Amino acid sequence: MNSQKGIVGCLLLACTLQMSAQVKTYKYRVNFRDKAETTYALDKPSAYLSERALERRMKQGLPVDSTDIPVCRSYIDMLVGKGAQLVSKSKWNNTVVVQVSDTSVIDKVAALPFVTAVRKVWTAPDSIPARNANRKKEVTNRVTKSNNYYGDAWRQIAVHHGDSLHAAGFRGKGMQIAVIDAGFYNADEISVFKGMDLLGTRDFVNSHSDIYAENYHGMKVLSCMAANKPNVLVGTAPEASYWLLRSEDDDTEQPVEEDYWAEALEFADSVGVDVVNTSLGYYEFDDTTMNYRYRDLDGHYSLMSHSASLAADKGLVLVCSAGNSGRGTWKKITPPGDAENVITVGAADRNLVNADFSSVGNTTDGRVKPDVMAVGVASAVAGNDGTVSHANGTSFASPTLC
């Protein structure tokens, strides 16, 4: 009898564990009505913006405004009190993202008087691939020296007269650049980055992750600017200072990545960077009902584009890739490349012939995009193992202009 009870108990435990494993979690974007209960003030911006950020605005005659005021903490606390977990927040959009496993919590959140909209932006995937715990062992840093100072990057530098700018002293010294991307795989071990002035890193997808173990895309983008190994690989801004910010979740393609990106952009503004490069863009998602349509490319419809359009008001120079959809059915630029006052960069080869994969414009309101073209065919970039490789994409055209 006792053995039977034991068997039943084990079965019940197994069923409970299975049900627990099947519990889905979701993330929702919540729009707030106002910032009425803020504890911050426009006349005391040093409470939420760094001295460097304020100096940048002062030099350009740009005022602090209500979008700079952080999201109301009291509103967030009330969401948490209903059972939601805070994931991210955006003061420019006056939104937060919360995570729940019980969707009835969202009904309670939506009923709050200061909430104007709620939208699901993420559903937990069935599995997440493990990161490479032995990534550092991949790095050999085996390189071949060139007679040219820029190494394999000499063509992409010369096409844009970057060598002339460097000779005149414009090598990025004194400038701060934020790179918002998918991850910076092995950038902490690759020799072309040794000596890079790194101001810091931040992961807006998962604060507990190692950005150097995530996707390699951001590392390759970074190498177009920050590489500084003479006769091997030298980038466009080798003496600049860098923030490495991860907003792309490589495991899924869901709208919440726009929220991560918006928060990363706001962080870059708050710490006082001068230039932001982002070689990311979205128009289709795992849930195809969330895909953008051409009529949405008005510079404001997507959360990313709305945030990007505000960057210039803060004194930021935002440079973004146009996208690589030229050969496909979409063909068009991808948000945030449709935003106003951002520099959207398409790809060309070393002879300045348009790359057929480079996304095209115009925007739905008739603005010409991309704004400029740069080398994005066979671009010299750092490889995952520290060698020098070549890659195609507007992702590498964009940083070549930074």
What are these regions (language model features)?
Residues 299-315:
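Catalytic-core regions built around general acid/base machinery
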Residues 22-85, 104-128:
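Primarily auto-inhibitory N-terminal propeptides
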Residues 36-37, 93-94, 105, 124-126, ...:
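Solvent-exposed loop/turn segments at secondary-structure junctions
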Residues 23-25, 117, 153, 163-203, ...:
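Subtilisin-like serine protease catalytic core
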Residues 76-157, 163-166, 340:
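Autoinhibitory propeptides
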Residues 268-298, 321:
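Short acidic, glycine-rich surface-loop motifs adjacent to enzyme active sites
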Residues 181, 334-402:
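Extracellular S/T/G-rich loop segment that most often corresponds to the catalytic His/Ser-adjacent loop
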Residues 1-24:
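Bacterial Sec-dependent N-terminal signal peptides
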